[in-house]
């Protein structure tokens, strides 16, 4: 993988439209992206890290309690935020991006789940992704977390990673060493011939795997899976511990 990105990644799609059902009752009145971890709403963690990586414009989709998110990001300038409104129909992780493509332009962009959290170790993982991006060999680059050692995650893992970063699915294996950490860089061309309406990003993962063009880099730091109210305290503790180490 290259060490310098020939084309900086300047735009991002941030997914903030989900219902947050597993986070209830908190999300009955507060959208999940605005739940605070480490003293800051999860959405702000995502946007701040995008800004640190050089992203200038972010498209944020909204559905559940949309007005709260719109008001929260209204004054942001780094990155500048444009809203993609999904109040009428929640379009999932793939369909929401397809709707927003006219706002994202023709260049590769970051795709970020607004609840993607990790404690950094002094380096910017998103900057590392931008540096690793190689449009000649990749259609999509994923940020991966080590399944073992992640906070709040008890799943079987998603991907196996070769030495050159090439990714394959877990398949029939009992476990895989890496989990998708909720951040990707992707080409807009991937969305050609995709369904109208809701669909999952998994469709594009599988397309990129089939063409041998899905790669991943491993997150430096500790990934925090904040899916339920019970996961908030461990995530807060992980942020506090990281802050002490790097103070």
Question: How should each PLM-predicted stretch be described?
Answer:
Residues 1-14, 22, 36, 40-113, ...:
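Conserved N-terminal catalytic core of the sugar/cofactor nucleotidyltransferase
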Residues 17, 63, 114, 145-146, ...:
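Cofactor-binding loop segments of dinucleotide-utilizing enzymes, especially the Rossmann-like FAD-
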Residues 25-28:
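Conserved catalytic-core motifs of eukaryotic protein kinase domains, centered on the activation segment
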Residues 19, 30, 65, 87, ...:
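A generic "binding-loop/recognition-motif" signal
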Residues 31, 55, 78-80, 137, ...:
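A generic structural signal for alpha->beta connector loops
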Residues 64, 140-158:
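Short beta-strand-to-loop element that shapes/binds the nucleotide-sugar donor at the catalytic cleft/hinge
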Residues 108-110, 117, 121-135, 147-151, ...:
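Catalytic-core segments of class I nucleotidyltransferases/pyrophosphorylases
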């Amino acid at each position: 993988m290259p060490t310098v990105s020939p084309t900086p990644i300047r735009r991002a799609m941030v997914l903030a439209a989900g219902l947050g059902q597993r986070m209830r009752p908190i999300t009955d009145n507060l959208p999940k992206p605005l739940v605070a971890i480490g003293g800051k709403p999860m959405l702000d963690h995502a946007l701040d890290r995008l800004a640190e990586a050089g992203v200038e414009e972010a498209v944020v989709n909204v559905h559940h309690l949309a007005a709260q998110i719109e008001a929260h990001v209204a004054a942001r300038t780094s990155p500048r935020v444009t809203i993609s409104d999904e109040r009428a129909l929640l379009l999932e992780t793939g369909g929401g991006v397809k709707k927003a493509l006219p706002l994202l332009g023709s260049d590769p962009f970051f795709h970020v789940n607004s609840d993607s959290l990790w404690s950094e170790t002094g380096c910017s993982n998103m900057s590392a992704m931008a540096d690793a991006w190689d449009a000649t060999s990749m259609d999509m680059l994923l940020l991966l977390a080590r399944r073992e050692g992640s906070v709040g995650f008890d799943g079987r893992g998603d991907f196996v990673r070769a030495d050159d970063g090439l990714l394959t699915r877990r398949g029939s294996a009992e476990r895989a060493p890496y989990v998708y950490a909720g951040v990707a860089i992707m080409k807009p061309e991937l969305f050609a011939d995709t369904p109208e309406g809701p669909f999952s990003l998994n469709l594009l993962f599988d397309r990129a795997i089939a063409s041998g063009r899905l790669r991943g880099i491993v997150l430096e730091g500790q990934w925090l899976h904040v899916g339920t109210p019970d996961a908030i305290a461990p995530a807060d503790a992980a942020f506090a511990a990281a802050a002490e180490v790097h103070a």
